[in-house]
Structures are given as C-alpha cells and as structure tokens.
C-alpha cells in the first residue's frame, strides 16, 4: 500500500457558483443556436450576492430574452428562495452584450487558405476563431475511457444533486463539492483511498445525521455501482462542520473557472481555454471535443492504453498548425504511426469538426455540469466510437 501513487480529482454540483455561471452561459448559447445555428457567441457570467451580470460578444440573426433565461436557469438549479441563499426570481440581472469584433469575424468567415492560398475547398473557408492549444485524453481505466478519480467525483456530485431534488435528503441545498483520491500502481487504479464531500444544508441539521445520510444515500450507492468496496475508504463529510451559506452568497462565481472539473480532473494537460458560453467556431471548445473523440477512438482501437493528443491553431487559419501525441509508455504501435492514423482518419479543421460532430445545435447546457467528457449521451457526439476500425487500418493493425 505504501508504494501506491495517490492521485486526486474533484467535481462540483450544479449549484456551485462557478457552475451556475457555466450553465447560464451555455443556456444563452443554446437559445441563440436554436434561433440561428450560425450565431457567434462568447458569453461570460458573474454571480454574487443577489446579482447576476452577463457580458460578452454575440453576432446573431435571432433574439433571446437573456434576463428571463438567467432567472429560469437559476430557479431550475434550485435557487428559488432566500432560504437557500439565492433567489432567481428576485436577484438583479444586468446584461452587457456587444457584437463580435469584425477583425475576428473576417478571419473566421474567410480563412487564410481562401484569402491567400486560393483554396476552393468549402471546409477551408472557416478559420479558427483564435490561436491556442487544446488537448484530448482517453485511458483504459474505466469502460468510459475516463480517468477513475474524475469519473467517480462526477457521479458523486450527480448523486448529491439527485437525492436533493427527489426529496430523499430534502434538507440538502444546491451547492456542493466532491473529491476522490485513488491509489495507483503505475497507471492502474488499485483502491479508493479518500472521499471528500462538502454539501450545503438547511439550518440545524446535526453533522452526524448529515454524515450518516450522505454515506448511505450518496457515497455507498455510487461506489457499489462502480464495483468499489467502501469499508476501507476514509470519508470526510463537511470537514468545516457547517455549510449553511452557499451559492453566490457564500462565494462569487464566474464562467470558465472549473476547466479541470470539465475535462479530465488533472489527469491530462489543459490548454487553458474554457468551454461554456462559446459557440463551435471557438476551437477552445470544438477542438477539445474533437480531440476527446480522437483519443477515445484511438484507445478503443488498441493504439495505446493511455493517450493524450495536443493540437494547435492560428487565428483565421483552417488547418491546425500542430499535432502531438503522448502515450506514457503504453503505446502498442509507434507514436509516429498514431499521428499518421489520426491525420488520415480525422479532419480537424473547424468546419469539419462542426460537421462531423453535428455541433451547430442547442446541445450545450447539459455539458455544463458533471463533465463534458465520459457521458455517453445521444447529443455528446464526441463520445461515439465510430472511427475505431478506420484507425486500426490506418495504423496497420
């Protein structure tokens, strides 16, 4: 046991202040895509005590009532009364939205390939919305090809929200966080060492009652469903002793501050660009989704047991300027063959990504909580295993 490498990931519930902001930003994005699929959207949200501020840049042919969307999202999360620290029906909402910069738009609408290289390929017309680096990752640790710590942390956070909403633990409130520490031998998870769970609750709930209820109704069901024995797990429930004040009253929140929660829990590197509130022309989002698709299919194809893929773009240029893989010593073919196979099987120009993953749809609000990756939902097209055979063939397997 002393030789185990301990690795930890965290998640948060939908009532966490930063996640409130992500959900508001993505709900606005969805509403705009529903009325104009070519909307250009970059929306940031800030929440604090009694106030929501929405700012950003939007270019669209449609119209949405942003204050109403904000309030509906907050109430749906569960903040509908001052008794739970925030009230979506009464809070102030301010909106500061401008148009996308024409300097950016000209590079997205008319990429370098068509302006300078005279390309006639329609997929070369759309340039990347910004420069930057993005990463995708997959591992054989779980059936979902996700790292086990973040996968369990998300499931605990989901369960925490579920028992609040269905009344099983009706005294819980929307804000909460989870954290899971796994003991590894190499890259193989061997045991769950520690679970930390903090949950907002109603006044005057005895800490021992909350602890017993959370272990019985949240931790044990999630761990048992994952085939994890719970008797040896160290559990820390509300370690401060009290968590009555939560949500924006306890901490200000901001879109894009949970980028490690949104991705792989720290098991993979991150390029720094957040997802929520951004339409698919922003490669921060669309390319990160595409690289999850790439990595998951490559691992499922047996090219490696653990794979990280990096891509880089230049603003206003369609084709990526860099592609790199890291296999952590787990590759079953040379890394050069993996890169060759990826280039042969996947078109990673922004327009091709949006086409192949069907991204010009209002599908993003659901991504804003409990992870953008690892949930095999119908609209999460980047989780499909539809290029496995092509990759095996391209890699010579």
Curated annotation (Swiss-Prot):
L-methionine binds at residues 57, 100, 251, 282. Its main location: cytoplasm. It comes from the Bacteria. GO terms for molecular function: ATP binding; magnesium ion binding; methionine adenosyltransferase activity. Transmembrane segments: none annotated. GO terms for biological process: one-carbon metabolic process; S-adenosylmethionine biosynthetic process. Catalyzes the formation of S-adenosylmethionine (AdoMet) from methionine and ATP. The overall synthetic reaction is composed of two sequential steps, AdoMet formation and the subsequent tripolyphosphate hydrolysis which occurs prior to release of AdoMet from the enzyme. This is S-adenosylmethionine synthase. It comes from Leifsonia xyli subsp. xyli (strain CTCB07). The gene is metK.
